[in-house]
Amino acid sequence: MMIEKQKALEMAISQIERQFGKGAIMRLGDTAKLNVEVIPTGSLELDIALGVGGVPRGRIIEIFGPESSGKTTLALHMIAEAQKIGGTGAFIDAEHALDPVYAKNLGVNIDDLLVAQPDTGEQALEIAEALVRSGAVDIIVIDSVAALVPKAEIEGEMGDSHVGLQARLMSQALRKLAGVTSKSKSIVVFINQLREKVGVMFGNPETTPGGRALKFYATIRLDVRKVDNIKQGNEIVGSRTRVKVVKNKIAPPFKQAEFDIMYGEGISREGSILDLGTALDIIEKSGSWYSYKDIKLGQGRENAKQFLKENKEIAEEIERKIRENFNLAYNKIKSAPDAIVE
């Protein structure tokens, strides 16, 4: 009886996959069996939480969260990772707030970065579509959905009512964009803010602007939150960030990743290596001392991170072991000479 039920279930699953594509249904315990091409996110923990080692090509991604939580930092890291493997990145700056010096600190080659500062939401989305259609751009970041103001609203009077205009614009644009993106190798990343729904008594009052279309069309939705400050003495030097994968169509969702974002330099690779290395017992921690094999890395987390920063070979050796443990590809990270701003 059980075998028959199992057979019937397998048949139903294979029929669903034939009709709606691989990954339309999966067991939560499954590891991602999809063979997808990815671009790393710049955070080892997040690559692991996504289940496939990064963000998948030919898909739409949404990164949302409160202000100053690290959304743009994460998106810029994705551009830097795409450039490291020889790709091209584009940044559609609807907020007119891109800081080139900060982008350079994160490892983005700003000389090769394509930047657009569109006047209207329509223009921003048409530029994105044209770049995807070209097939020559690996990652396109749109910052942010809230700043994609429809032309009618810009040209209208101050007090005019424009209910639902932005949602309609997003819905129309995403229908086209989703089609061309899925046939391409491009990743389209939308950065979104959070809004409070008025008068919500039960459930989550938080919502994202731009209507519901993006929630449907996004393959992956990442909820980015600042958890804590990172201090050195009395000085705040960074923030501990938590990213929750609230939607994932290519691997089981609801996984979480925590990592350090250091002010002025972005996601701390050394912090990730230290945390994951300790969790996997590759790095030993006794009291506040961290050690690897017979090498003392330092007392306290920040000191151990500094040691790994100065001793790149040891950091790379530990990272390789972590990646092997999670079956992630290892790209030797070259620190580009122009990626360091004194």
From Swiss-Prot:
Q: Which SMART domains match?
A: AAA
Q: Where along this sequence does the record place binding of ATP? A: 65-72
Q: Does the keyword DNA damage apply?
A: yes
Please provide the record's keywords in A-Z order: ATP-binding, Cytoplasm, DNA damage, DNA recombination, DNA repair, DNA-binding, Nucleotide-binding, SOS response
Which GO terms of the cellular component aspect does the record hold? Answer: cytosol
Q: Enumerate the Gene Ontology biological process terms.
A: DNA recombination; DNA repair; SOS response
- What are the boundaries of the signal sequence? none
Taking the first listed entry, what is the main subcellular location of this protein, grouped into a coarse class? cytoplasm
Q: Where in the cell is it found?
A: Cytoplasm
**What would be an example GO MF term here?**
damaged DNA binding
Which PANTHER family does the record cross-reference, listed alphabetically? MITOCHONDRIAL DNA REPAIR PROTEIN RECA HOMOLOG-RELATED (PTHR45900:SF1), RECA (PTHR45900)
Which NCBIfam families does the UniProt record give?
A: tigrfam_recA
Outline what the protein does. Can catalyze the hydrolysis of ATP in the presence of single-stranded DNA, the ATP-dependent uptake of single-stranded DNA by duplex DNA, and the ATP-dependent hybridization of homologous single-stranded DNAs. It interacts with LexA causing its activation and leading to its autocatalytic cleavage.
The record's similarity note reads: Belongs to the RecA family.
Q: What is this protein called?
A: Protein RecA
Q: What is the lineage of its organism?
A: Bacteria, Bacillati, Bacillota, Clostridia, Thermoanaerobacterales
